[in-house]
């Protein structure tokens, strides 16, 4: 069992396989060109798997593949099959923007993928293009349809932005409700790489919009293993809101992140990291596990978004850590 310095059980590993992304979303990616990490500096699938295998042996129950955009890395289904074949009952999931998903969904499902989280901030073509800096909506919707068709469990992630997509909150909710998908609205997490002036809706503003049509929704008892607070409409449909600005958001954090370069990240907000790259490439797996335990001991109690200070902006590059 893996325990951090505050007694929290850590059983969830998020693995970024690439920092590259084919979108330039306002809340995540810088607009100006910059240098990607050279591909030869990334851990191979084999080395990533060595660490995942050891982490599972130490008590990890859930593995999520992230990016950047993970579907940009070739042979991702091969990598997922490696993990699935080692531990068939592992909770194996993927986070994606959905743009390439229609061609990959069946391969991923056949490889052992169980669930997929897909970003959908709007159902308006022009708004989607404004957010992603690219014409994306049609292909994202095709990806969602194909993932559903092949039997992947789907959650939709939506980051409502003030003055951009706040008018689309109800439409996204209705889209998911009609298809039986869970939707989670995510408060914008201020970060160094977001577009200047980007502002998100807070949880109260999101709830106020939903209450315009569904005034009698109620709060659901929180599942401490989930970052979202869920709410239930009168017909039983549940939606979630992820609230990183709330004081208790980090209280039950159960996750650790591994970047494609081999850095272990204890917290999405902070820059602190330690590398397991040399250890896994040298097959010193015990050393990699010791680094993991050391990183967990350094895991902070909470992020700084909860201080409700507009100056608290994370310098973490979210596209490298998968959010």
From Swiss-Prot:
Compositionally biased intervals (Basic and acidic residues): 302-313
Annotated PROSITE patterns: MOAA_NIFB_PQQE, RADICAL_SAM
Residues where GTP binds: 14, 64, 95, 155, 255-257
Cofactor note: Binds 2 [4Fe-4S] clusters. Binds 1 [4Fe-4S] cluster coordinated with 3 cysteines and an exchangeable S-adenosyl-L-methionine and 1 [4Fe-4S] cluster coordinated with 3 cysteines and the GTP-derived substrate.
Catalytic activity field: GTP + AH2 + S-adenosyl-L-methionine = (8S)-3',8-cyclo-7,8-dihydroguanosine 5'-triphosphate + 5'-deoxyadenosine + L-methionine + A + H(+)
Enzyme class: lyase
Name of the protein in its database record: GTP 3',8-cyclase
Organism in which the protein naturally occurs: Aliarcobacter butzleri (strain RM4018)
């Amino acid at each position: 069992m893996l325990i951090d310095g505050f007694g929290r059980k850590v059983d969830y590993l998020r693995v970024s396989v690439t920092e590259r992304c084919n979108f330039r979303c306002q809340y995540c990616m810088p607009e100006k060109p910059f240098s990607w990490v050279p591909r030869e500096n990334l851990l191979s699938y084999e080395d990533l798997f060595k660490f995942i295998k050891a982490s599972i042996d130490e008590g990890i129950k859930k593995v999520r593949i992230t990016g950047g955009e993970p579907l940009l890395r070739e042979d991702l289904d091969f990598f997922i099959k490696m993990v699935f074949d080692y531990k068939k009952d592992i909770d194996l999931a993927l986070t994606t923007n959905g743009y390439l998903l229609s061609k990959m969904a069946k391969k991923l499902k056949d490889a052992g993928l169980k669930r997929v989280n897909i970003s959908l901030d709007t159902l308006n073509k022009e708004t989607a293009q404004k957010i992603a800096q690219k014409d994306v909506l049609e292909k994202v919707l095709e990806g969602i349809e194909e993932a559903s068709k092949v039997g992947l469990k789907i959650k939709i992630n939506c980051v409502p932005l003030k003055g951009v997509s706040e008018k689309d909150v109800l439409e996204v909710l209705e889209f998911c409700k009609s298809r039986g998908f869970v939707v989670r609205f995510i408060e914008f997490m201020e970060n160094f790489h977001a577009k200047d002036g980007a502002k998100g809706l807070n949880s109260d503003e999101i709830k106020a919009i939903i209450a315009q049509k569904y005034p009698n929704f109620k709060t659901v008892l929180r599942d401490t293993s989930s970052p979202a607070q869920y709410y239930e409409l009168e017909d039983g449909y549940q939606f979630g809101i992820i609230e990183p600005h709330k004081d208790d958001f980090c209280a039950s954090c159960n996750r650790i992140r591994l970047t494609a370069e081999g850095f272990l990240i204890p917290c999405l907000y902070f820059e602190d990291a330690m590398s397991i790259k040399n250890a896994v490439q040298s097959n010193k797996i015990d050393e990699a596990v010791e680094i993991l335990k050391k990183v967990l001991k350094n895991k902070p109690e909470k992020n700084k978004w909860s201080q409700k200070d507009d100056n608290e902006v994370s310098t973490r590059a979210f596209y490298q850590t998968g959010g």
